[in-house]
């Protein structure tokens, strides 16, 4: 895993830069989904432990958050688990695949908070079936304030707990304007929510993404619009979840890596 070790120092630096921000998201205030009803979901793991979420966008590619990589240390062999509902049960639908390489967005080094997106290439292609399916990126417009969206993940249901949920859960959040998110009473520019980011949460702070589900999808009206990135604390109304918006520049970058899809 030479590719993995070559990034270890960089992501330790990025990790230190992001320590004041909760960048390992989970689901707060949601409910368990029907088993295998979200067949595009991926669990990125090491040693059998869930680290981050992800989305299968091609049989050999998973989309996730770039900061997830710094959680691995030299010598570890991370894997991707597809077709799961329960993390602990021995489900016949599960496929555990080795990771060939991580490809963070090219400008993540210069601006890690606003370019928190990464491709994960699998060693072998996933076998698509009713439990393992791709989620295509079709987002063409920005998200308007007030839009209702769903976030899915295996994160903890209690913001004070570090234990992930054993089963896949989902919560509905509301998109907030960048002006509000960057205001003094919200994030006050730390981090600054750019046009490549969006924040979403709940007016009462009871619904949020928080620890353990970074890289999972934000789906609005059936369209895959963004991935979970971070946020201060968990379930706090004035510190809503932060998401990397799948803007044109990211979609172009993704396509450039996937086409031709299996020759790298």
Swiss-Prot record:
Gene3D superfamilies recorded: Trypsin-like serine proteases
Enzyme Commission designation: 3.4.21.-
Entry's Gene Ontology BP terms: granzyme-mediated programmed cell death signaling pathway; protein maturation; proteolysis
Magnesium keyword on record: no
GO cellular component, one term: extracellular space
Pfam (any one): Trypsin
Keyword terms of this UniProt record: Disulfide bond, Hydrolase, Protease, Secreted, Serine protease, Signal, Zymogen
Disulfide bonds: 52-68, 149-220, 181-199, 210-234
InterPro entries: Peptidase_S1_PA, Peptidase_S1_PA_chymotrypsin, Peptidase_S1A, Trypsin_dom, TRYPSIN_HIS, TRYPSIN_SER
Compartment(s) where it occurs, according to its Swiss-Prot or TrEMBL record: Secreted; Cytoplasmic granule
GO molecular function, one term: serine-type peptidase activity
Signal peptide start and end residues: 1-24
Highest taxon in the source lineage: Eukaryota
PROSITE patterns: TRYPSIN_DOM, TRYPSIN_HIS, TRYPSIN_SER
Domain Peptidase S1: 27-259
Residue numbers covered by the propeptide annotation in the UniProt entry: 25-26
Entry similarity comment: Belongs to the peptidase S1 family. Granzyme subfamily.
Protein name: Granzyme K
Organism of origin: Homo sapiens
Taxonomy of the source species: Eukaryota, Metazoa, Chordata, Craniata, Vertebrata
